Amino acid sequence: MTSSTTTRSEALFERARAVTPGGVNSPVRAFKSVGGVPRFIREAHGAYLTDMDDTRYVDYIGSWGPMILGHDHPTIREAIATALTGGTSFGAPGEREVELAELVTRLTGAGRVRFVNSGTEATMSALRLARGFTGRKFIVKFRGNYHGHADGLLVEAGSGLLTNAEGVLGSAAPSSAGVPEEYASLTLVSEYNDPAALDALMRLRGHEVAAVIFEPVVGNAGVLVPTPDFLEALHRVKASGALLVADEVMTGFRLSLNGATGLLGLEPDLTCWGKIIGGGLPVGAYGGRADVMDFVSPQGPVYQAGTLSGNPLAMAAGLATLQTLEADPGIYGRLEAYTAALASGLRAAADEAGVPVSINRVGSMLTAFHQDVPDGSIRTYADAARSDTTGFATWFQGMLARGVYWAPSQFESIFVSGAHTDRELNVTLEAARSAYGGTPV
């Protein structure tokens, strides 16, 4: 289970850098914040990844969330194979997209659902819809919440963009080059888990706000859990006429069959999904109140389209995934139990080694922040940004060398799947004890 060579990954990374920016197709994969050679993966089965050098890892990325059932699940594989016999793309409606939409509306209570090709497309489309429905132009987001890479949302964003930037009540600077300040000026920024700040912003600007978009449980600043008073403040934004938009791209169908909103008792006007809803294939969706969704073309005036939207392979994978989750009511309890045991074991390993670590967890999502504060006390973007990223990088490399593939960023969640068992838990905690203790590999 220990890493011995990265020869083929190194060679592929060198080739990739000659033809792809940074050698990867999504920044976090480059290991820039943790150092070392990014592993190029050959295959994935169950709870394991195998790289091009034949090293096997217990996987806690799960393709950044979609693989809640584990990699190469036989039911999902069979559903994709069956769909493949009928063709790969139609550019016309198909039965599976109707079936998946019916299932999503039943599980979540959404009045209508529209499928797109990514989480970014989902959030981008939902906010365009909110503007079209309300006739207003401003959007409110929260510092450290990541909603994909649409221009107007790359403002005080999380994920690979996490910084210590100082925000204000109102517009803030873009988080990326290439985003005009004019775009960013239409995005107002507030503090996650600060109900007073949100209330103040809405009193001042609420009449101009089309939507407030939020992660019910933050995953791209590390896991941040909402406080009850913040949840109450979120519901109050509706009084201004603004729409409440839940970004459940990460949490949808992971924390419950109705995602984090169901778990927390939230009632958003619109919800965005991705990851699990496509069973590991490229997909996104947005949906919610029927009167709002009826503003989407061709029924309404808000345009949104996509060549591959409703792709039959993605619909088959998503349908099989959600049907499997619904048919196994005990899966969320098992995911909870495994992740709780993982958190407890990490806590004990860090304490034994004298390494400052603070663990945040909800269901099968977890972040171990390298900070000397109590578990669960990291609640904001600014709190998370105080983490010891150098210490985390050292620990990450120690885990990787011992056959455990953790998220290669301090500011990301890890994801547990139904394929993780006591065997993987024991391997992980043994690796953690050695990595925290600095034991040579």
Swiss-Prot record:
GO terms for cellular component: cytoplasm. CDD domains: OAT_like. PROSITE patterns: AA_TRANSFER_CLASS_3. InterPro entries: 4pyrrol_synth_GluAld_NH2Trfase, Aminotrans_3, Aminotrans_3_PPA_site, PyrdxlP-dep_Trfase, PyrdxlP-dep_Trfase_major, PyrdxlP-dep_Trfase_small. It is found in: Cytoplasm. It is an enzyme of class 5 (isomerase). It comes from the Bacteria. Pathway: Porphyrin-containing compound metabolism; protoporphyrin-IX biosynthesis; 5-aminolevulinate from L-glutamyl-tRNA(Glu): step 2/2. It catalyses: (S)-4-amino-5-oxopentanoate = 5-aminolevulinate. Its cofactor is pyridoxal 5'-phosphate. The modification N6-(pyridoxal phosphate)lysine is found at K275. Keywords: Cytoplasm, Isomerase, Porphyrin biosynthesis, Pyridoxal phosphate. It holds the Pfam family Aminotran_3. Belongs to the class-III pyridoxal-phosphate-dependent aminotransferase family. HemL subfamily. This is Glutamate-1-semialdehyde 2,1-aminomutase. The lineage of its organism: Bacteria, Thermotogati, Deinococcota, Deinococci, Deinococcales.
